[in-house]
């Protein structure tokens, strides 16, 4: 516990909350253009993860994960990006929203459809 003299000398610093998705600039989602697709995960795991390098409208160049099985994203695809990290891919702090703009929904998906941009089957 500091003394009154110490508190006069230097005041208490407020806790600053740092954003986990700075490239979105406080917006829920951002639009961007893909510049390249796929990378590999960190140590105990190995595979080609579906990841796209995206240049956002905010000017940031980020790495975003493409969720779901199969995708049609390629270079120059316009995509919508939301926050949310991927645990085994360092530096991947964003997800691409499926079913909007150029990113199509997951084919033949029955459950959890809203997360993968799939309409209700007839």
From Swiss-Prot:
Its main location: plastid. Part of the 30S ribosomal subunit. Belongs to the universal ribosomal protein uS12 family. It holds the Pfam family Ribosom_S12_S23. GO terms for molecular function: rRNA binding; structural constituent of ribosome. Keywords: Chloroplast, Plastid, Ribonucleoprotein, Ribosomal protein, RNA-binding, rRNA-binding. It is found in: Plastid, Chloroplast. It comes from the Eukaryota. PROSITE patterns: RIBOSOMAL_S12 (PS00055). This is Small ribosomal subunit protein uS12c. Disulfide bonds: none annotated. GO terms for biological process: translation. GO terms for cellular component: chloroplast; small ribosomal subunit. With S4 and S5 plays an important role in translational accuracy. Located at the interface of the 30S and 50S subunits. It comes from Illicium oligandrum.
């Amino acid at each position: 516990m500091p003394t009154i003299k110490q508190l006069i000398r230097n005041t208490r610093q407020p806790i600053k909350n740092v954003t986990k998705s700075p490239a979105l600039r406080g917006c829920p989602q951002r639009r961007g253009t893909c510049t390249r697709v796929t990378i590999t995960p960190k140590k105990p795991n190995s595979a080609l993860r579906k990841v796209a390098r995206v240049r956002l409208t905010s000017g940031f160049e980020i790495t975003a994960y493409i969720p779901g099985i199969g995708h049609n994203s390629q270079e120059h695809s316009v995509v919508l990006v939301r926050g949310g990290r991927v645990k085994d891919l360092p530096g991947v702090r964003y997800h691409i929203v499926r079913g909007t703009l150029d990113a199509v929904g997951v084919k033949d998906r029955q459950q959890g459809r809203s997360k993968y941009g799939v309409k209700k089957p007839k």
